[in-house]
């Protein structure tokens, strides 16, 4: 039942590897240290079944940890063995999966042994405030001499009726920093000794960003 759990990892970048047919495959590298079960939620006490997972355990003296975290979080960490984690994520699972783990249990890439496809969730790269041509792929205005709206969006409303622009239209705004899930990525290799996973293709985020890896739904293997 641990196969229902997700893993918190870190994007390390991209590299190329050769597959068994000799083809060059672009892969994303994800490093996964030990994940800790920080909290268990059941339908009887919380209304749903879930497991809270912690990662990136702080290696520092106790006095330093007390300064970095609030008293509420310190009390929360003591229930799971006293290990303070920088990252906490909650995964909704079945009742059997909750019963298969205990507070303070550690697990890693071994739960994905034999898994061929995974879903990866992360925060996309932030690109700042962008116009409609970059963000939405608008064509823009005429490029001829005398034109004054080369990169404008064009008309987005009418005159006196309704006398306003309807909400939800595509306009210049902040681009990136969105929660993105890339589904059904092929697992190229899982190296338990080096604690890294190679998946085919690109994943959201910058180098060093936190990603959540889970088994793809509806995919055998």
UniProtKB/Swiss-Prot annotation:
The keyword Ribosomal protein applies. GO terms for biological process: translation. InterPro entries: Ribosomal_uL3, Ribosomal_uL3_bac/org-type, Transl_B-barrel_sf. One of its GO terms (cellular component) is cytosolic large ribosomal subunit. One of its GO terms (molecular function) is structural constituent of ribosome. Keywords: Ribonucleoprotein, Ribosomal protein, RNA-binding, rRNA-binding. It holds the Pfam family Ribosomal_L3. One of the primary rRNA binding proteins, it binds directly near the 3'-end of the 23S rRNA, where it nucleates assembly of the 50S subunit. Part of the 50S ribosomal subunit. Forms a cluster with proteins L14 and L19. Belongs to the universal ribosomal protein uL3 family. This is Large ribosomal subunit protein uL3. It comes from Chlamydia trachomatis serovar L2 (strain ATCC VR-902B / DSM 19102 / 434/Bu).
């Amino acid at each position: 039942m641990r196969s229902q759990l997700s893993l918190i990892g870190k994007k390390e970048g991209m590299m190329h590897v050769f597959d068994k047919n000799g083809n060059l495959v672009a892969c994303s590298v994800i490093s996964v240290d030990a994940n800790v079960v920080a909290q268990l939620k059941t339908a009887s006490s919380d209304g749903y079944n879930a497991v809270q997972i912690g990662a990136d355990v702080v290696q520092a003296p106790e006095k330093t940890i007390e300064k970095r975290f609030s008293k509420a979080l310190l009390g929360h960490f003591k229930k799971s063995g006293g290990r303070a984690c920088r990252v906490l994520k909650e995964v909704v699972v079945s009742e059997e999966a909750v019963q298969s783990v205990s507070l303070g249990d550690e697990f890693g890439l071994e739960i994905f042994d034999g898994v061929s496809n995974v879903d990866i969730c992360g925060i996309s790269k932030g690109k700042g405030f962008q116009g409609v041509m970059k963000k939405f792929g608008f064509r823009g205005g005429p490029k001829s001499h005398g034109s004054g709206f080369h990169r404008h969006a064009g008309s987005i409303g009418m005159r006196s009726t309704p006398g306003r622009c309807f909400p939800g239209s595509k306009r210049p705004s902040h681009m990136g920093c969105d929660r993105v899930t890339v589904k059904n990525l092929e697992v190229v290799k899982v190296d338990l000794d080096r604690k890294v996973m190679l998946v085919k293709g690109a994943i959201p985020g910058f180098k060093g960003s936190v990603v959540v890896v889970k088994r793809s739904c509806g995919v055998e293997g």
